[in-house]
Amino acid sequence: MNSIENLKEQSKSVFEIRNVAQIGVLGGISFILMTIEFPLWFAPGFYRLDISELPVLIGSFAMGPLAGVLIEMIKVLLYFFIHGSSTAGVGDFANFIFGCSLVVPSSILYQRHKSRKTALIGLGIGTLTMTVASALLNAYLLLPVYSVAFHMPMAALIQMGTAVNPAINGLWAFVLLAVVPFNLFKGILISCLTMLLYKSVSPILHNRIRH
């Protein structure tokens, strides 16, 4: 019951003026990080890695899961309105879902008992949740949308995966050998950075929130 009450209290405090400002700043930082991206050697070139979830995770650890969702939303909306979308917003919506699937489970578990152990468990569960969500959405939504948006048959997209890994010979091989490793790598990287940076950044965030 205490953990539920804590989450309710955090949800109320999120909309205090100082917290709203803090969420806005973290959303802006996340947007900037989202524009800095690079490919990974084991995935096709149109999958590019960024660490924009790092400020989202840090904010959600400090202020709770609702704050994390709002930071993620600000990041995605800024990117959509400034850079536009070649997929009519579908890719941006999926990015929001992926981010929330990492951030929400991680922060909920961390808020239940704030310790290094629960942070690690939460980040592990969040990484797995994001990976599963990404695998399903890529298979049933994103890859078909990319095929239409880029005027490429699905076979051509899969062939881009085959060029990187000859074992990729179909849709689910693409998902299991490219999408899943990509998201596991991303989740582990961002989790490690969060563990390294949160204790240093946390006092600043909490001072701004509480004082």
What is the predicted function of each stretch?
Residues 1-211:
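Loop-helix junctions at membrane interfaces
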